[in-house]
Amino acid sequence: MHELALTAELLRLLENNAREKGIKHIKRVKLVIGALSSVLPEAVEFSFNTLKEGPLFEDAKLEIEEKPVRIRCRDCMAEKAVDHFYPLCPSCGSGRVSIIEGKEFYIDFYEGE
């Protein structure tokens, strides 16, 4: 479960950034997780709620935006959201597709005081 290690690092980054900015309490954290990132949102949420400690994260809420897989065909230039990555364009059947969304894993923002 690599989500535990990822979440521990995420909390460390948030703590360091909050300290630099003089923030004493983080209220809300928004993450973006892509469907192809190999990161399970439920495991990150569990890890966040398990690992957050101290006054900085006391009331912190985690919001996760899940990004679907989007591909672009390099032949017909179609852009499509797909349920699962399949290396063929759903419009023309070409195998020349690029993933343009779905690999993300980042902190979008956090709110604190």
From Swiss-Prot:
For Zn(2+), which residues are the binding ones? C73, C76, C89, C92
Does the keyword field hold Metal-binding? yes
Q: Which domain of life is it from?
A: Bacteria
Recall the GO molecular function terms of this protein's record.
nickel cation binding; zinc ion binding
Biological-process GO terms, alphabetical: protein maturation; protein modification process
User: What keywords is this UniProt entry annotated with?
Assistant: Metal-binding, Nickel, Zinc
Q: List the disulfide bonds.
A: none
Q: Where does Ni(2+) bind?
A: H2
Q: What exactly does this protein do?
A: Involved in the maturation of [NiFe] hydrogenases. Required for nickel insertion into the metal center of the hydrogenase.
Family according to the record: Belongs to the HypA/HybF family.
The name of this protein is Hydrogenase maturation factor HypA
The species this protein belongs to is Moorella thermoacetica (strain ATCC 39073 / JCM 9320)
Q: Which gene encodes it?
A: hypA
